[in-house]
Amino acid sequence: MAETFLFTSESVNEGHPDKLCDQISDAVLDACLAQDPDSKVACETCTKTNMVMVFGEITTKADVDYEKIVRDTCRNIGFTSADVGLDADNCKVLVNIEQQSPDIAQGVHGHFSKRPEEIGAGDQGHMFGYATDETPELMPLSHVLATKLGARLTEVRKNGTCAWLRPDGKTQVTVEYYNENGAMVPVRVHTVLISTQHDETVTNDEIAADLKEHVIKPVIPEKYLDEKTIFHLNPSGRFVIGGPHGDAGLTGRKIIIDTYGGWGAHGGGAFSGKDPTKVDRSGAYIVRQAAKSIVASGLARRCIVQVSYAIGVPEPLSVFVDTYGTGKIPDKEILQIVKESFDFRPGMISINLDLKRGGNSRFLKTAAYGHFGRDDPDFTWEVVKPLKWDNKVQA
């Protein structure tokens, strides 16, 4: 067996205070886009005990009840009393929202006068997309498992299987890999860590037994578990106080959980609460589609794509591709295929990925359990684009 290494990814579920904020920001975005697809939205949320504040810059024709969106989102997650960390119906809701800066508006969309191909990037920045053939989702296994454990925790809380669960929770998975000429091959799960909020009545033994039976078993394939797999289940011993009561929350603080679990790279820009002129979001979505399409087409087993922008300029400043030595043809040729197959101008990304369409909780769904590797028609950037290349050529 080749030499192996350990790699760890974490996730948090929808009751984590930072994720609560992401979901509120994206629920606001959904509401704006549903009524006015040209809404310009930069919506931040913060929360602490008994308080949620929504603030930012929004220019929209939509009639939006911000307070109702906040309360509905908190309630749907399960924050229905102070005991669980926040009472959706009685907490304070503060709103401080202004219009988009006219300086930004004229530079990016010319106060709504520019054609789609002329729309400039809403800011400077660089974004990365990543894909790997180690899972059917073409996502890193460590990230997929951590994310699915978090989603499963919420599922068994909401369906009553584990009635002692409360909304807040974190997961972390360490996977043993070996490197097969640049491709990542998972061997086994080394460690599983779950810290979940719980009520006063349950014992630590019950927590451990229920988590193994109802959360870990259904999520982690048996082939990855063995007698050496380590389980840390609520290792702190007590997690009754959670949600915004336990920690303050803020939009945009879980950007690695939202993307690739520490694999690939990250340009630093968060996603939630941003309309598609914000390339932090739309740029990251299009390069995920590019990287995924490269791997799905057999051009490479693993791939990262970077794009960069200047504020007000439609064309990207740079596009970069690296296949970690797994490419069937040289990376510079793959880069050429990417440039011919994908339009990186923000206005065209919006059209090609249908990113101006709100409603149906479209962006709210992205705000918990990851933006990538999801099987949902609303996640248009996960659709593989056929790439034309001569696959008889071997590197």
UniProtKB/Swiss-Prot annotation:
GO cellular component: cytosol
Record's catalysed reaction(s): L-methionine + ATP + H2O = S-adenosyl-L-methionine + phosphate + diphosphate
Enzymatic class: transferase
EC numbers, comma separated: 2.5.1.6
Cofactor binding note of this UniProt entry: Binds 2 divalent ions per subunit. The metal ions interact primarily with the substrate. Can utilize magnesium, manganese or cobalt (in vitro). Binds 1 potassium ion per subunit. The potassium ion interacts primarily with the substrate.
Main location: cytoplasm
Chain sites annotated for binding K(+): E44
Classification via InterPro entries: ADOMET_SYNTHASE_CS (IPR022631), S-AdoMet_synt_C (IPR022630), S-AdoMet_synt_central (IPR022629), S-AdoMet_synt_N (IPR022628), S-AdoMet_synthetase (IPR002133), S-AdoMet_synthetase_sfam (IPR022636)
Annotated GO biological process: one-carbon metabolic process; S-adenosylmethionine biosynthetic process
Binding site for ATP: H16, D168, G169, K170, S236, G237, R238, F239, D247, R253, K254, A270, K274, K278
Subcellular location(s) per record: Cytoplasm
Positions bound to L-methionine: E57, Q100, D247, K278
Pathway involvement of the protein, from the record: Amino-acid biosynthesis; S-adenosyl-L-methionine biosynthesis; S-adenosyl-L-methionine from L-methionine: step 1/1
Keyword entries, A-Z: ATP-binding, Cobalt, Cytoplasm, Magnesium, Metal-binding, Nucleotide-binding, One-carbon metabolism, Potassium, Transferase
Domain of life: Eukaryota
Gene Ontology MF: a single term: ATP binding
Keyword ATP-binding: yes
Cofactor dependency: Mn(2+); Mg(2+); Co(2+); K(+)
Binding-site residues for Mg(2+), renumbered to this chain: E10
Subunit structure: Homotetramer.
Function: Catalyzes the formation of S-adenosylmethionine from methionine and ATP. The reaction comprises two steps that are both catalyzed by the same enzyme: formation of S-adenosylmethionine (AdoMet) and triphosphate, and subsequent hydrolysis of the triphosphate.
Family in the record: Belongs to the AdoMet synthase family.
Listed name of the protein: S-adenosylmethionine synthase 3
Species per Swiss-Prot/TrEMBL record: Populus trichocarpa (Western balsam poplar)
UniProt gene name: METK3
